[in-house]
């Protein structure tokens, strides 16, 4: 995850590291994957465990259903168990990717980890100071405030992600790709962070790049 020691974000370049995690797969997977649910790849090889990330928003591109997640989650090219085929990765500079979701159905929803879900009706851009929430497989649903917009983050090895939404929501390994939202509005997908600050790829930019709509 990110290693960002500065809380004052205006004009600050924060250092970062990738945010996928390795773990044993859960016993089963739901037919429809909601935002914030765990995603794990098919086995990358003998003796190696799958990669984990979190699902973002369900989208439609020319009537084909996909799940958004972080681009650094899909850059390995492995398909996702019980979900679908890995489609693409946009990382670095931006940080988003798609996974085919042929068995999914219904509207784009976020797992609130209390037995309920939140339907996402539209994409938007938050205001600095606004209350927002995120959902992820590791830290579940957590909320905080927007600290800044259009933030640049350094992953190391010359890799940067630009234009991110910064929040004070704590995140953990495996949360990458999870949705940033509030009520019925989706704002972004998690690129990374730590227990003090987190950064999200803005959702409107991703939808425009794909020519997509929310499912």
What are these regions (language model features)?
Residues 1-29:
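Secretory targeting and sorting signals
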Residues 4-6, 16, 75, 135, ...:
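Residue-level detector of bioactive/disordered segments in secreted/extracellular proteins
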Residues 25, 79-83, 114-115, 126-130, ...:
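Short amphipathic alpha-helical surface micro-motifs
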Residues 30-116, 120-121, 135, 154-155, ...:
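Catalytic histidine site
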Residues 125-158, 171-172:
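Flexible, gly/ser-rich surface segments that form the specificity/activation loops bordering the active-site cleft
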């Amino acid at each position: 995850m990110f290693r960002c020691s500065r809380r004052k974000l205006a004009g600050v370049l924060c250092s970062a590291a990738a945010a996928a995690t390795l773990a044993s797969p859960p016993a089963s997977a739901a037919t429809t994957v909601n935002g914030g649910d765990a995603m794990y790849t098919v086995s990358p090889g003998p003796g190696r465990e799958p990669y984990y990330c979190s699902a973002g928003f369900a989208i439609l591109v020319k009537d084909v259903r996909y799940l958004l997640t972080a681009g650094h989650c899909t850059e390995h090219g492995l398909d996702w168990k019980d979900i679908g085929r890995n489609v693409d990765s946009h990382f670095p500079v931006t940080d988003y990717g798609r996974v085919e979701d042929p068995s999914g159905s219904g509207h784009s929803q976020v797992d609130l980890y209390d037995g309920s879900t939140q339907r996402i009706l539209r994409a938007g851009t938050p205001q600095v100071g606004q209350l927002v929430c995120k959902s992820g497989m590791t830290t579940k649903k957590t909320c905080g405030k927007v600290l800044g917009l259009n933030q640049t983050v350094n992953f190391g090895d010359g890799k940067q992600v630009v234009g991110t939404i910064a929040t004070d929501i704590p995140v953990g390994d495996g949360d990458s790709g999870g949705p940033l939202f509030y009520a019925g509005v989706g704002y972004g997908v998690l690129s990374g962070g730590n227990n003090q600050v987190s950064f999200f790829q803005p959702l409107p930019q991703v939808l425009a790049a794909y020519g997509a709509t929310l499912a």
